[in-house]
Amino acid sequence: MQTELLLDIERRTDYTFKYNSHFGRHGWLRLTPAYSVKLVRELIKKDCTENSNILDPFSGTATTGLVAEELGFNATLFDINPFLIWLGNTKCKHFSAGKLLELQQEFDNCMEDITLSENFWTPPIHNIERWWHPVTLEILASIRHKLASTFNEPNGNYYHNLVWIAFSRLIIETSAAAFNHVSMSFKSNSTQYEVSQIKLLFEAIFNRIITSAKTQLTGKAKVIKGDSRDLSAHGKE
């Protein structure tokens, strides 16, 4: 007779991505493999002394680096994913309140006049209409076209990157993707949004990001492109 061993393991959602959604910069984008702010804070407070320099060879969404900065530590993080390096360095950036105000005005001006067209670029995703309703997709593509002409494509301008992070959040929020569990699935139907609905949502997302970007960080963190299996080439970076 086979005996099954059942382990009563407590679920700690406070140690997962679910905990991060209301914590400023940590909630900019939801990536389900991320661990929580709470877990990193507990580990840093337990194991680090005043002059500790923190190393994270698997940066991911840069949770470790950002928490380190918030607690006044310096941190160096590594990753091989260009998107995560871009996202992590933007999240860990020290922003000027004055320049954020200028960015807010630039964004507001950009959103005043959006020209709709079916001819604007969309990503070459198979069965893309499973992700977005055709009407919604046209609106998103039109907004993206206007953003690219105003702020250029995502690059090393950390202020403009805030706009692109907000847009990334927008395309997730308006998609048919369901994130009610760790893996991703699709809702039965995509939603057709109006231009006014998408603009209001985008503005709300961007305003939240701008507000959290104003929070001053006391430490310093950076994400470097590197393979965690061999960091010797990076010396004492």
Predicted regions and their residues:
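S-adenosyl-L-methionine
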Residues: 1-50
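Short, charged/polar micro-motifs that form catalytic or ligand-binding hotspots
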Residues: 26, 30, 78, 130, ...
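SAM-dependent nucleic-acid methyltransferase catalytic core
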Residues: 137-237
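Conserved phosphoryl-transfer catalytic core
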Residues: 81-150
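Hydrophobic (often cysteine-bearing) scaffold residues that line and stabilize catalytic clefts
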Residues: 32, 36, 84, 136, ...
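Short amphipathic alpha-helical segments, especially helix-boundary/capping motifs
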Residues: 13-20, 62-63, 114-120
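Conserved S-adenosyl-L-methionine
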Residues: 36-39, 43-112, 194-235
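Short linear capping/connector segments at secondary-structure termini
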Residues: 20-22, 121-126, 183-187
